[in-house]
Design a protein with these regions (language model features):
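Iron-associated oxidoreductase/ferritin-like identity signal
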Residues: 1-182
Length: 182
């Protein structure tokens, strides 16, 4: 059993390494951002499930239930892979707040379902910015299992974007990609 002093020494080493990793990004650090986004996304999906109103709210709530279960599975799978790679995970609310780039919105409870769907699309799209960066870093570091998991997550997110966009009557990338002026 570790003494309090040994625990503190390990924790301070973790904090120091996290600071280094976030100033010179590593695959592990970038995937920490991915985990934080998944955690924030879970809270937002739950909030939407609790407050969805409208003519098709039961179908929407069922969809959210599925997305929540998948989100939990993805978060656990990502955590396990990082542990397999010898990484230290973000686990506290403070870390998720610091590393997450999805924004929480307490007003979601008042939104209609199309606004909630648009928010989910934006979140999956934002999450993919970090996932794509994690893929590049993992490949550069030759951490191929991490890269493979992130490629899988990218595909999952893209599929969710397409499905949600179709619920709004839009094509998969409609309104999401910046237009090239050339």
């Amino acid at each position: 059993m570790l003494s309090n002093e040994e625990i503190e020494t390990r924790y301070q080493a973790e904090v120091k390494q996290a600071d280094v990793d976030h100033h010179t990004p590593t695959a592990g650090a970038m995937i920490g951002h991915v985990m934080a986004n998944l955690t924030i996304q879970r809270r937002k999906l739950r909030q939407m499930k609790w407050y969805a109103k409208g003519i098709n709210n039961q179908a929407f709530k069922a969809q959210l239930t599925t997305l929540l279960a998948e989100n939990d599975m993805l978060l656990d799978k990502t955590a396990e892979r990082l542990l397999d790679e010898g990484e230290v995970l973000p686990t506290t609310q403070a870390e998720y707040t610091e590393y997450g780039m999805l924004t929480e919105e307490p007003r979601i409870k008042y939104w209609d379902m199309p606004a909630m769907i648009a928010e989910m699309i934006a979140d999956y799209n934002t999450a993919n910015l970090f996932v794509s960066r994690a893929i590049k870093l993992a490949e550069k570091e030759e951490r191929f299992a991490l890269a493979a998991d992130m490629v899988s997550l990218m595909g999952y997110n893209q599929h969710q974007i397409r499905e949600l966009q179709s619920q709004l009557g839009k094509a998969a990338r409609e309104g999401l990609d910046e237009e090239d002026d050339d």
